[in-house]
Regions:
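Short, small-residue-biased leader/transition segments that mark boundaries at the very start
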Residues: 2-6
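Loop/turn elements at helix/coil->beta-strand transitions in domains of secreted/extracellular proteins
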Residues: 49-54, 78-83, 109
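Histidine/acidic-residue-rich catalytic or RNA/ligand-binding cores of hydrolases
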Residues: 65-71, 93-104
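Short acidic/histidine-rich active-site segments
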Residues: 80-95
């Protein structure tokens, strides 16, 4: 309840100002425009997109066999995008599309990540070997291949301070048939 909020406020030394909402002119402008701000393919032609990796979760945005596919505008446009993830045809909207995405922050390559969450509709357009600098030095990207069946190694990662690494460890153990649901309960 509210008592818990006050306890946490005191524990973390948060002032009342921390909880105040500050309103700006930009907020009013954004609300006034509502859904009228639309990014079109023409906008993407000249957009120098800066993200190195773009994930698109909608139907047909990765339809590389048709003109006007959005992932192509990122890859072949004037920006710095190296890889995109898009869907070639209709895709189920009830998928957990961001499952394990945190592994990208641990140096896992885009293609390795995509392999873990692959669907028939989804594709990597661009460089599947692209990876981000890991938040801390590790060999996770290599270990996913070279230590795939090493149950002891993956069990050791269940104690990782990173939830994403723990999730990967569970996935690797499950795929290898080295852990049961009973062990987790």
């Amino acid at each position: 309840g509210l008592g818990d909020v006050y306890k946490r406020q005191e524990k973390y030394h948060l002032t009342d100002a921390f909880f105040e909402t500050k309103k700006t002119e930009a907020d009013d402008d954004t609300k006034a425009k509502g859904d009228q701000t639309i990014v079109s393919l023409e906008d993407l032609e000249t957009l120098a997109a800066q993200p190195r990796f773009v994930m698109l979760n909608a139907c047909y945005n990765g339809s590389f066999h048709k003109p006007g596919y959005i992932t192509g505008y990122y890859i072949f446009g004037p920006g710095r995008t190296v890889a995109t993830q898009g869907n070639t045809v209709n895709v189920l909207q009830d998928r957990w599309t961001y499952e394990l995405v945190g592994l990208l922050s641990h140096g896992v390559r885009v293609g390795q990540y995509n392999r873990l969450i692959a669907s028939l509709e989804g594709h990597i357009i661009g460089d599947p070997a692209f990876r981000f600098q890991p938040v801390e030095p590790n060999t996770l990207a290599t270990d996913m291949t070279t230590r795939k069946g090493d149950a002891a190694y993956w069990r050791s990662l269940l104690a990782s301070p990173w939830a994403d690494v723990q999730s990967l460890a569970l996935r690797m153990l499950t795929d290898a048939g080295a852990i049961s649901a009973g062990e987790l309960l």
